[in-house]
Amino acid sequence: TAEEKEVLYTLFHLHEEVIDIKHRKKQRNKYSVRETWDKIVKDFNSHPHVSAMRNIKQIQKFWLNSRLRKQYPYRDGSSSNLSSGSAKISSVSVSVASAVPQQQQQQHHQQHDNVKEEPEYQISPDASEHNPQADTFDEIEMDANDVSEIDEDPMEQQQQQQQEAQAQAQAQAQVQSAAAEMQKMQQVNAVAVAAAAAANATMINTHQINVDQISAEKLTLNDLLHFKTARPREEIILQIKHPSEATATQIHTIPTQAQQHPMATITA
């Protein structure tokens, strides 16, 4: 809209020394140009007369188009350009007005006298009028350089994005490696705990009984089933005292072949 154009023209005029390639300072930093464009975009989008948000590419394109089409009203020397333009328009109108009667007079002579006359052309002493497009070409060349400088900033943004992506990938790889190490440690701990539990179970199931110190009355069926010894069974003699005959001593010899206890099948 017209109000948005006026807002942009005002912002361009405010920061013209930085963004204009013809009027900017020679010793300027491209980061300052980037910050200036960001400030222009921020001020434009926060203006109350702006109906739609615009990004930096759209505003930079509008700036270049307005410069190329000579629609930017706040340029230095704009009054002189306008005065020279009005002088050009007036001279062109005068030349056209003088050319029309000459053409009519030429046609009149051709019809009656069959005499051809060359029209007289006015040559202006101002050399700039012969090439009205010279300023436009200069504008295009200078603004093309400005476009190349504007395009430098997105490359830096792309490099920064690539560096950030690489940093994120490295961080993710470190997190994944740490998680894998933790998982391996947990697996090792689980294996160690399982091995310790199996060792404890083996120790419980294969406990040794000293028959010489324990009487047969205190032995249970499970103790007899899990009974293991390093000596041959023929050398082991159990002295079992019968409850009814406390004084009598019966000597029982354990045979070589292990006999299955009748209650073993039930308890197993």
UniProtKB/Swiss-Prot annotation:
It holds the Pfam family Myb_DNA-bind_5. Self-associates forming complexes of several hundred monomers. InterPro entries: Myb_DNA-bind_5. Residues 94-108 have a biased composition (Low complexity). Residues 1-72 bind DNA. Involved in transvection phenomena (= synapsis-dependent gene expression), where the synaptic pairing of chromosomes carrying genes with which zeste interacts influences the expression of these genes. Zeste binds to DNA and stimulates transcription from a nearby promoter. The keyword Ubl conjugation does not apply. It is found in: Nucleus. It comes from Drosophila simulans. The keyword Transcription applies. Residues 94-133 are annotated as: Disordered. This is Regulatory protein zeste. One of its GO terms (cellular component) is nucleus. Residues 110-119 have a biased composition (Basic and acidic residues). One of its GO terms (molecular function) is DNA binding. It comes from the Eukaryota. Keywords: DNA-binding, Nucleus, Transcription, Transcription regulation.
